[in-house]
Regions:
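Short, intrinsically disordered, charge-balanced linker/junction segments flanking boundaries
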Residues: 181-187
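Boundary at the C-terminal end of the N-terminal hydrophobic targeting segment
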Residues: 18-20, 25
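Sec-dependent N-terminal signal peptides
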Residues: 4-14
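Hydrophobic face of amphipathic alpha-helices that form TPR/SEL1-like repeat modules
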Residues: 42-49, 53, 76-85, 112-121, ...
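Short coil/turn and helix-start
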Residues: 33, 51-55, 69, 85-91, ...
Length: 187
């Protein structure tokens, strides 16, 4: 009964968090101006995606940078995306790579997968499929669905690793369960 109650509470919290959306507000702006790194990051997300305001990459970059300067790793990862795409700043793929690697090394799963992509495509670094596989695998182990698909694809085709149909199936299945359509197609 205790396990069931814990599961119900966990599912309820997860659903509430999924439907909670950051939105621009005076309170958020005030908190960001007072130096709250999470508020700065959330405000940057509002500007980046247009949550409750107009999309403004320059303002997003400013707030991501402020939060990143204080060591907030989600903001460091977000800055890497800004530099990679030239959103709110001059495009700098080498800096994008360095920032993404920093966030990945600090344990950000999303950054690990993105770092794999950067290595695979040679964006901001020398192309290295072995390193791409390594970072995809770390992100996949952490539950990242896209990384699980990438690991499966690499195993299927022997990219950066020895081809292994059983491992490919295992990772396609993990990714498919999380809703990745390409993984579902490959099963």
């Amino acid at each position: 009964m205790t396990r069931l109650l814990s599961l119900i509470i966990l599912v309820t919290i997860t659903v509430q968090m999924a439907f909670a959306k950051i939105s621009f507000s005076t309170e958020l702006l005030n908190s960001a101006n007072q130096g709250n790194v999470e508020a700065q990051y959330d405000l940057a997300l509002c500007y980046y995606y247009g949550y409750g305001c107009n999309v403004d990459y320059e303002s997003a970059f400013k707030w991501f940078d402020g939060s990143a300067q204080k060591g907030y790793y989600p903001a460091i990862y977000a800055l890497s995306i800004c530099y990679e795409k030239g959103h709110g700043c001059i495009r700098n793929q080498e800096l994008a790579f360095s920032l993404c690697k920093l966030a990945a090394e600090k344990g950000m799963n999303m950054a690990k997968n993105r770092l794999g992509i950067l290595y695979e495509k040679g964006i901001g670094c020398e192309k290295n499929v072995g390193n791409a596989f390594k970072w995809y695998n770390m992100a996949a182990q952490g539950g990242d669905a896209e990384a699980q698909f990438n690991v499966a694809f690499f195993y299927k085709h022997g990219i950066g690793c020895a081809a292994n149909a059983d491992s490919a199936f295992f990772w396609y299945e993990k990714s498919a369960v999380q809703g990745v359509a390409d993984a579902q197609f490959n099963l």
